[in-house]
Amino acid sequence: MANLKAIHEQAAHSGEGSRANIRSIWKEFSSVVKIGIVNSNLITTFTGLWLALYFMGEGFLENLHIVFFTLFGSALVIAGSCSINNFIDRDIDQFMERTKTRPTVTGTMEAKRVLWLGIIFITVGTLSLLMTTVTAAIVGLIGAITYIFLYTMWSKRNYTLNTVVGSISGAVPPVIGWTAVDPDFHVVPLVLFLIMFIWQTPHFLALAMKRCEEYRAAGIPMLPVVHGFAMTKRQIVVWVACLLPLPFYLFSLGVPFLTVATLLNVGWLALGLYGFKMKDDLKWAKWMFIYSLNYLTILFVAMVIATLW
């Protein structure tokens, strides 16, 4: 009986150890591929795809294969790009609080494996997008190349415009979604691209203000590091103001959507202007960052809901 009890206890401990090991592996994998970025970009990818189906008069259920290949391929291309970004930035990530525990910094994942993971993911993701349209695959590759070479390897460590350059790749996902259904030019994916492109600069500049000293320690020339908070706040307000006219190019989604989008834009702009009166710049930056996250989610969900009225 004693031996049997010991065996059961050993098995229980072994099971707990296995589960803990799986959780650890998943945590490391999620960190390397930046799972949060992947998930948020899939929201915009899906919205682009959904709107294309809506405007083209195509049924969702009849195109489930397109939905699958688009989301699967996009997820892999984005995850692969983020993996290579981690590989390249492993020397500076150690200086930042939010990145110093990444597996590429701690050494829990071999750098070469992370690089190959990224290459394989981008390759398989591109092949998946090819199952939809060639245009979608090309757009996905443009996003990956822009993120890896123009942003990570070139502008990030050299110019304060790195945020703007990085916004190009971040604006690509909804265009992938649209072109997977309709590869021809249309104003809607252009507007989606512009919304994402413009949104990212105030979003990441607010983050840069919050993490200013970390970026300074890492030697990354973010705008608040080089030109200070006052200049950064002015830039943020200008970029947010540029969002104001864009929803009106999506007037076919209806008045309720235009109302929601306009209120979101006006609210963000008002909060931005309030920053010139606030004395606590870091607190304001935190508010702006949180607002930007909610803004994007609400806006893109509202686009989908608008097609269901």
Curated annotation (Swiss-Prot):
GO cellular component: plasma membrane
Principal location: membrane
Keyword Cell membrane: yes
Cross-referenced CDD domains: PT_UbiA_Cox10 (cd13957)
Membrane topology, record value: Multi-pass membrane protein
Pfam families: UbiA (PF01040)
Further remarks about this protein from its record: Carbon 2 of the heme B porphyrin ring is defined according to the Fischer nomenclature.
Subunit structure comment from the entry: Interacts with CtaA.
Name of the molecule in the record: Protoheme IX farnesyltransferase
Species whose genome carries this gene: Geobacillus sp. (strain WCH70)
Taxon lineage: Bacteria, Bacillati, Bacillota, Bacilli, Bacillales
